[in-house]
């Protein structure tokens, strides 16, 4: 089947969980919702399910369109669908919006049952462990005892790794793409600067901006602009725009003059229109806190000692946000723990965002690995 085939029109589902969820910080959500989309069919043995975990600004809408009029497909439509690397003719694929998100799952935009008002800044801090715990509840709801694979890029890859550690018997394969076993100091610094842009916006109103009929648009816009720079290759913007001007000469002022300025402001404005600032704060802190080795004497090898999953790890040559060396740390730990791991470093000019793009070598590698996952489903 053609690589251009889509899953078509898809309908999200909001799954209610009328149960408490105790979070890593000791707080409890009395109940929670998870917004999901599914693609393909769960087989009779219920052993062909694949969980897709999203990155910082992702959500449940992985593939397809919500209507025929939709201009854009899901964020990983080139990866998930009939005849694609994660083939929905063979796998039952589940995408979800994580807790703390702003696309239907319980988060800052949800109603706090204790107050009858939106949580806003009162939504509790969540971690990758908390997400995986809620995803395990989702697996129970769907009747899935074991995922054929848990797949994610960037922050999604951290979730795939945490799944293999937290629930070793429930994951057969973990695909960790463009990720890291913990953030570097530089990455934490980037996240903090982004948060400060939001927190110091006069319209933030201590996180309760919606009750004041405001939005910290300036801060969120700057956070996204800065983040977008780091997701590209070192001189990705230079190759794309150079020093091209929007007009024939310098204007000698502070308005938008360079094409790169126009591009970044467009990206920032688009992001403000679809994302919540409190969610952005929560997601970046979840990134900062992720460090599974910390529970095992700061030994990543010990952290993966009990995993049962086989691993596929991929990095990209020009990704400096999650450099190949960070993937090497995980690969070396898995080898030291005598676990099964396949690794590929893809030559790409697209930086961190390469994991979202349709690179031939990358797609071929994921396809080959998922063929092995499919074979395991048939044993």
Swiss-Prot record:
Reaction equation(s) it catalyzes: L-homoserine + succinyl-CoA = O-succinyl-L-homoserine + CoA
Cited function: Transfers a succinyl group from succinyl-CoA to L-homoserine, forming succinyl-L-homoserine.
Would you say which domain of life the source belongs to? Answer: Bacteria
Q: Where does substrate bind?
A: 224, 353
What is the main EC category here? transferase
What is its pathway? Amino-acid biosynthesis; L-methionine biosynthesis via de novo pathway; O-succinyl-L-homoserine from L-homoserine: step 1/1
Q: Which gene encodes it?
A: metXS
Oligomeric state and interaction partners are given as: Homodimer.
Annotated site (Important for acyl-CoA specificity):
321
Q: Which GO terms describe its cellular component?
A: cytoplasm
* One of the GO biological process terms: methionine biosynthetic process
Q: Output the PANTHER family linked to this UniProt entry.
A: HOMOSERINE O-ACETYLTRANSFERASE
Q: Which family does it belong to?
A: Belongs to the AB hydrolase superfamily. MetX family.
Q: What is this protein called?
A: Homoserine O-succinyltransferase
What organism does the record attribute this protein to?
A: Neisseria gonorrhoeae (strain ATCC 700825 / FA 1090)
Q: Where is the active site?
A: 154, 319, 352
Q: Domain AB hydrolase-1: where?
A: 48-357
Q: Mainly resides where?
A: cytoplasm
Annotated GO molecular function terms are: homoserine O-acetyltransferase activity; homoserine O-succinyltransferase activity
For this protein, the record's InterPro entries field holds: AB_hydrolase_1 (IPR000073), AB_hydrolase_fold (IPR029058), HAT_MetX-like (IPR008220)
Q: Which UniProt keywords apply?
A: Acyltransferase, Amino-acid biosynthesis, Cytoplasm, Methionine biosynthesis, Transferase
């Amino acid at each position: 089947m053609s690589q251009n085939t889509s899953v078509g029109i898809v309908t999200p589902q909001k799954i209610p969980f009328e149960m408490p969820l105790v979070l890593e910080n000791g707080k409890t959500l009395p109940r929670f919702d998870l917004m999901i989309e599914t693609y393909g069919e769960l087989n009779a043995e219920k052993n062909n399910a694949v969980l897709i975990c999203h990155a910082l600004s992702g959500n449940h809408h992985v593939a397809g369109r919500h209507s025929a009029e939709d201009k854009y497909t899901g964020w990983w439509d080139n990866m998930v669908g009939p005849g694609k690397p994660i083939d929905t003719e063979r796998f039952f694929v589940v995408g979800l919006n994580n807790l703390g998100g702003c696309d239907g799952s319980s988060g800052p935009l949800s109603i706090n049952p204790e107050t009858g008002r939106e949580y806003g800044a009162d939504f509790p801090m969540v971690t990758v462990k908390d997400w995986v715990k809620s995803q395990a509840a989702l697996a129970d709801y769907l009747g899935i005892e074991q995922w054929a694979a848990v797949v994610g890029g960037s922050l999604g890859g951290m979730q795939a790794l945490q799944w293999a550690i937290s629930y070793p018997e429930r994951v057969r394969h973990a695909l960790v793409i463009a990720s890291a076993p913990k953030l570097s100091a530089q990455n934490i610094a980037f996240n903090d600067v982004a948060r400060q842009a939001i927190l110091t916006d006069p319209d933030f109103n201590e996180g309760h901006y919606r009750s004041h009929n405001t939005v910290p648009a300036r801060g969120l816009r700057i956070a996204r602009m800065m983040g977008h720079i780091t997701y590209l290759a070192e001189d990705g913007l230079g190759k794309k725009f150079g020093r091209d001007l929007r007009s024939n000469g310098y204007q000698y002022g502070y308005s938008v003059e360079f094409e790169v300025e126009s591009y970044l402001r467009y990206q920032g404005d688009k992001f403000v229109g679809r994302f919540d600032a409190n969610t952005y704060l929560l997601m970046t802190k979840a990134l900062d806190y992720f460090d599974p080795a910390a529970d095992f004497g700061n030994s990543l090898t010990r952290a993966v000692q009990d995993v049962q999953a086989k691993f596929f790890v991929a990095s990209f040559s020009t990704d400096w946000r999650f450099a190949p060396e960070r993937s090497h740390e995980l690969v070396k730990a898995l080898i030291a723990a005598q676990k099964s791991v396949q690794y590929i470093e893809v030559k790409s000019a697209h930086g961190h965002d390469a994991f979202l793009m349709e690179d031939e070598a990358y797609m071929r590698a994921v396809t080959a690995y998922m063929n092995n996952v499919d074979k395991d489903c048939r044993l």
